């Protein structure tokens, strides 16, 4: 069931880290650098078996099923990943009052996600590449003894690709005319401007649309290689995921902050930020069925559901003013923040007739008051209180996602007039030092979160296509979080060399919920799905964390740490067969979750270079947490449902055939 689950692999996860810092030679120690590099890779813990290849054929239209087994039979890692993270910072100290710095942060990653359907055809999965580059330049200037400012500009570029075989760049496609010789490069991408008959190699094909792309030499397998399907759900017998996603985002902005100690009681801070975000996303699927699309084809953008593209900009502007008041009897922080967001786009004018037209999105302006008070009750104890408003804008994908309306389609679209998520938070707590090394902390908190996003399904009567439906992201959700946290901190003392941190949290997280996972409205009948207040999917009522460390600091120091966690399971919606009623959403909980990790290290130096040897052990007790469960039992180990009853007699007749796997697998 789980290939290689009992095998121990010492090198499954590999990490290499390096840190370098110091002054640049010949600069009089005015120019310094700080750099780091980290490479990590792992095969993951889920494996498949390569029984099939992408180009295998199968036929399920006959009683005697035909199934090709073109794979090597090798065991293949199904969720591998690798990443490279880098940092370089240069700092130039012009004078004691002026300092310039520049910083680069980069990350590159590649991964494949586990897809159960492709367990026996692992080459059919997509792969993902991600790159992120962040550059910033900053100046710190102390104007006087009591005032200083920071100003910096920054850029952030993100590039994400998900594809099969190799990434495709439509801008690099070669214009094609019928009969042209295009060679045998398997990565070749051709662009055909007009519909018609075309001679492409040995194939005479019909191009149906303007601005079509074709891949005449690609390795994609036709969907007709697999004829029919077994009468019960099973695994992939060949073929691949032909979907592609390309997402590029770029941010450019600047920020200015100034701080001034006006007098002994007032420290004033103020600042503003301006940022422009750009996002474009292209999502398409390769069409190849040996009939309508006899050569792997990419349909024109935004002309069919198989190819969508959008490019949008948004502007963010924010500013704040804060005053820190320090008196002998209390400390208070008073502040107000202003945020403005301009999506610079359009959205559908009528939710009940999304094809009617679009109107311009409104600019969103938000004011956020905030206050924090600390009141000493003894020389070693403090009471504190805070209250504030916080806003979070939706992701740009939820604002701008583009799709196609049409007969029989149920597209999901973005809505650029979304409001920001609003959180109002209250917290009251106490800190008390019990001794030189031990302190306790306790607080109660409450969060009121409104305008959360929900995916609303809407049925409407299309003037073009008749009864239709679509889904759109809207501000429909609400949640409430309340709870208490208690913690105990023990600083390291020279005698025992031990430090510890223990905390316990109790909280409830409730909000709107619907059984389908999205709000539903039928414009034809006026019916809307009933809203219920239930525990949300990420709610964990009880969480206990503990960290205990024994350390000896220094160049030749050592240390041993244990990190443990115990928590209640997440909510789930039970399914009770033949019970005669439908349970409320998230009305039961998964089993407790627990973990214990360990870290051991030893420092040493060689030729004035510091080294650290360390050992990390995750899940020391080899505890198997039940994160995914059967919703009739609430456990992952068993179910009352006989899975074989879900398989037809026609399917059972092929038990034991090569390539046929049961539901239990």
Question: Language-model features: where?
Answer:
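Transmembrane beta-barrel wall of Gram-negative outer-membrane proteins
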Residues: 8-110, 130-148, 369
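Transmembrane beta-strands of outer-membrane beta-barrel pores
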Residues: 37-43, 106-110, 155-159, 274-280, ...
């Amino acid at each position: 069931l789980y290939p290689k689950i009992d095998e121990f692999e010492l090198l499954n996860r590999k990490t290499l880290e390096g840190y370098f810092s110091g002054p640049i030679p010949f600069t009089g120690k005015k120019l310094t650098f700080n750099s780091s590099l980290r490479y990590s890779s792992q095969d993951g813990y889920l494996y498949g078996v390569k029984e099939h290849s992408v180009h295998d054929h199968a036929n399920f239209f006959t009683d005697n099923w035909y199934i090709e087994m073109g794979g090597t039979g090798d065991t293949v890692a199904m969720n591998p990943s690798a990443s490279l993270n880098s940092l370089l910072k240069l700092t130039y100290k012009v004078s004691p009052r002026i300092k310039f710095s520049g910083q680069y942060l980069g990350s590159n990653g590649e991964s494949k996600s586990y897809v159960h359907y492709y367990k026996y055809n692992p080459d059919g999965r997509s792969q993902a590449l991600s790159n992120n580059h962040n550059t910033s330049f900053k100046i710190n200037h102390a104007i006087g003894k009591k005032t200083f400012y920071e100003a910096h500009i920054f850029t952030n570029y993100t590039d994400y690709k998900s594809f099969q075989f190799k990434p495709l760049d439509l801008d690099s496609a070669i214009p094609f005319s019928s009969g042209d010789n295009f060679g045998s490069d398997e990565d070749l991408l051709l662009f055909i401007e007009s519909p018609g008959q075309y001679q492409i190699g040995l194939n005479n094909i019909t191009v149906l649309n303007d601005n079509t792309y074709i891949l005449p030499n690609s390795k994609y397998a036709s969907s007709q290689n697999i004829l029919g399907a077994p009468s019960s759900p099973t695994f992939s017998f060949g073929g691949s995921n032909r979907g592609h996603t390309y997402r590029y985002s770029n941010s450019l902005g600047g920020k200015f902050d100034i701080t001034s100690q006006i007098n002994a009681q007032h420290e004033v801070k103020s600042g503003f930020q301006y940022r422009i975000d750009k996002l474009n996303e292209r999502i398409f699927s390769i069409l190849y069925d040996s009939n309508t699309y006899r050569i792997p084809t990419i349909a024109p953008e935004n002309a069919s559901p198989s190819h969508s593209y959008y490019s949008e900009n948004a502007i963010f502007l924010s500013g704040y003013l804060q005053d820190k008041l320090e008196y002998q009897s209390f400390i208070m922080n008073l502040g107000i923040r202003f945020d403005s967001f301009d999506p610079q786009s359009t959205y559908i004018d009528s939710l009940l007739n999304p094809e009617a037209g679009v109107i311009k999105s409104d600019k969103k302006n938000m004011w956020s008051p905030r206050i924090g008070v600390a009141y000493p009750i003894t020389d070693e104890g403090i009471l504190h209180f805070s209250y504030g408003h916080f806003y979070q804008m939706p992701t740009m994908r939820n604002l701008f996602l583009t799709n196609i309306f049409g007969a029989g389609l149920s597209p999901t679209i973005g809505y650029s007039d979304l409001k920001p998520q609003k959180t109002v938070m209250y917290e009251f707590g106490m800190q008390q030092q019990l001794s030189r090394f031990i302190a306790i902390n306790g607080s109660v908190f409450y969060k009121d979160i409104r305008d959360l996003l929900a995916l609303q399904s809407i049925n409407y009567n299309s003037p073009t296509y008749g009864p239709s439906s679509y889904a759109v992201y809207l501000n429909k959700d609400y949640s409430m979080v309340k709870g208490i946290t208690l913690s105990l901190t023990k600083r390291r003392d020279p005698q025992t060399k031990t430090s510890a941190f223990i905390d316990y949290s109790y909280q409830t997280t409730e909000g709107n919920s619907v059984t389908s996972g999205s709000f539903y409205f039928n414009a034809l009948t006026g019916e809307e799905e009933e809203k219920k207040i239930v525990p949300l999917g990420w709610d964990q009522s009880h969480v206990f964390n503990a960290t205990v460390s024994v350390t000896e600091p220094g160049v030749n120091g050592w240390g041993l740490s244990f990190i443990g966690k115990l928590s209640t399971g997440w909510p789930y919606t039970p399914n009770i067969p033949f019970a005669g009623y439908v349970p409320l959403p998230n009305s039961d909980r998964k089993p407790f979750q627990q973990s214990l990790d360990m870290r051991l290290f030893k420092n040493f130096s060689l030729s004035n270079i510091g080294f650290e040897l360390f050992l990390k052990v995750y899940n020391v007790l080899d505890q198997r947490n039940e994160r995914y469960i059967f919703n009739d039992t609430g456990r992952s180990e068993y179910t009352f449902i006989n899975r074989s009853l879900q398989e037809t007699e026609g399917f059972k007749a092929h038990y034991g055939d090569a390539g046929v796997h049961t539901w239990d697998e």
